[in-house]
Amino acid sequence: MYRRICILVLTLLAAQSVCFARTVNPGMRAPDRVSPGGFSPDSLNTATSERNQRLYDSIQSKTNRRAVPRMLYRMLFVKPVLDTTMNGRVLDESRLLEPYAGKTVGDITIERMMPFDSCGNWFERAGNKTHMLTRERVIRRDLLFKPGDKFDPQLVVRNKQLLRSRPYISDTEVIVVPDSLDSTRVNMVIRARDSWTISIDAGIHGEGRTMVGLSDANIFGTGNTLKIKTNFSRRDFSYGGNIVEYKIPNVLGTFYTADFSAGRDFYNSELNLGLRKEFIRPTDYEIGLTYSDIKSKRYMVDLDTSLLVKVRNLDVWGGKSHYIRSIKSSVFLTGRYSYARFSRRPPVTADYNPALHDHDAMLFGGGLYREKFYTANMVYGFGTREYLATGYKAELVSGYSWGEFNDEMYLGMSYQTGGFRGMGYICLLYTSP
C-alpha cells in the first residue's frame, strides 16, 4: 500500500512539473530548420536530459504494474511530437515558403480536427465525443488572405500565430500545394486542431465569500467565450450574485473584438463594455472603446480598513501604421483619451487619496516597430509550438492630464527589443517617463 501511494505521489508531482501539458501535433511534416544566430538553447545539456529521461522511464515502468496508476500516467503524460529544443533549432517558416511568394492564392481548404488523439485513453475519447468542433466559417473568417490575393510568406506565418492565439485552437498547419494546371497559382490547406475549452474556476475570498465559475471558450463551436461565475457565502451558503462574461474575438470577420461583463459579487458590482481592433498587419489601423462602471471595496492604508468605491471609466483610442519597405519597419501614430469619474469614495484633497481623483487625459504617440515570428517550443518545451516575436519597438509619447486639483503634462519614451542570441531568447526594455 505504501509503495502504491509513493508511486501515485511521484506521478502527480511529475505531472505538475509539466503543467499538465497535453497537446497533439496535427501531423506536421518536419522541414529543414533554420537557426538564426546559431542559437543553441540550454536544453542541449545532455546529462540533464538523460537524467530527466531516466526519471520519466522509471515512473512509467512503475505505473504500468497497476491499472489506476497506468491510467493516470497515460492521462497526464505525453511524449513530445515536435521538439525543436532537442536539436537546438528555431524554425523560420517564412523562409520555407519563399518559393511561393508572389503567386496567386487559389482554393483554400479548411480541415478541422478534434482536440485529442482518437487512439488516446478513455478520457480523451470521451472528450472528443462530447466536443463540438469549431465551425469552418469561424476559422475562415480569421484568415488574413483570400483567393485571388498574392501569396505573402510573412503574412501566412503571422496568420498561423493569430490562429494559435485563439483559445479554441491548439495548433494549426498551413500546407501549400502548387496548382497542377496553373504554375502561377497555389492552393492552400489549413489544418486546425481544436482545444478543449470547457473549464471550471473557483476562488476563496475574505469575509467568507466564495466563487465558482464555469466557462466555455468555444460556445457551440462559434469561437465565442461565455463565462458564468456564481458567488455565495461559505459560512451560511447565502447567495451573493452572478457575473456573466461574453467575448467575441472576431466580429463578422472584421477583426474587431467585442466583450461584455455584468453582475454583482455581494457588495461589488461591475458593468464592462468593450470594442477594439489592434494592429495585425504591418500596414494597418487600430481603434477601440471601453466603458466600465465598477463598485468595489478598496483597502485604505491610513484607515486600515476597506471602503466601497464607485467609479466610471471611459477609454477611447485609435492609430495608424504604415510599412516602409526600405527599412523593413512600420511607422505608427496613435492617440488616446480617457477619463475617470468617482461617484462614491472617501474624502480627497490635493495630496490625499490621489488615486481617487477625477481626471481626464489625452495622449499621443509615435514611433517605429519591426516584428517577425519564429517557430520554436523552448517556452514550454513539451512538443507545443510557440510563435516568438523578434524585432524592436521605439516610441515617443506626449500628452496632458486635467486633474481635479491640478493639471500635468506628460512626456516619455520607450524602447524594447527581442531576439535570439547565443545564450537564448533575449528581451530588453527601456522606459523613461
Regions inferred by a protein language model and the residue ranges of each:
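Bacterial N-terminal signal peptides
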Residues: 8-16
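Immediate N-terminus of the mature polypeptide
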Residues: 2, 20-433
